[in-house]
Amino acid sequence: MPNLLYIDTSASKATVALSQEGKTVAIRTHGNANEQAAVLNVMINDVLEEASLTMDNIDAICVCAGPGSYTGLRVGLSTAKGIAYVKDIPLMLFNRLDLIAWGQDKKVPFAIALKARNEEYFFATYTDKGAQENSPQHLFEQDLIPYASQDLLFITDDAEFSASRHKEEIDANHTLNMNSWIVHAEKRFSLKQFDDLAYSEPFYLKAAYTTQSKK
């Protein structure tokens, strides 16, 4: 099985982890978003040292490419691309909405609605097995009302979310479920489903500054 390096800087809490033989062998988190650029390489060195590995032992890099913090996404992906280029190893990008969905244990269809800005959300729907039903998109809260009528369970990080009463709140900065990420990363690695290093970009889903209002 491959040795995989994981980087997530899509939220204010940065996470770096290593997996071997399907298990997390080292993980570091850092809670200050303003320091991500300064500490990311230190975190990478720390997990490598804990696992008694060097970058030469890493077979591929997995990065949460968003949606999320614009600055964080650029920091994480640029670091991952730099390492992948220098070490000539594959790069795999993952969508944060999918990563959260894969970590759920639901028996019903559900939706992920992460707060983008006030009354704006990064949104996607999933089957009861966690399979994506519609592509992640940026929507205003009123655009979610038709989905609420489908009796979907909304999983959201916004305590003020009001499009549906059928909701479950998660911490906006919770650490992603590494077990489910590892399963999907190792499957992609075995199938050689890698991203193009030269053309890989963050999954922004929306412009950096949104002035549109539907009110």
Q: Language-model features: where?
A:
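Surface "functional belts" at beta-alpha junctions
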Residues: 23, 32, 90-177, 190, ...
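A glycine- and small-aliphatic-rich helix-loop capping segment at beta-alpha/alpha-beta transitions
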Residues: 21, 77-85, 128-132
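DPxDG-like acidic metal-binding loop motif
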Residues: 60-91
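Generic hydrophobic alpha-helical segments
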Residues: 40, 44-47, 51, 101, ...
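Stable alpha-helical structural segments in soluble proteins, enriched in small hydrophobic residues
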Residues: 47-51, 86, 104, 178-189
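N-terminal beta-alpha supersecondary unit
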Residues: 1-63, 175
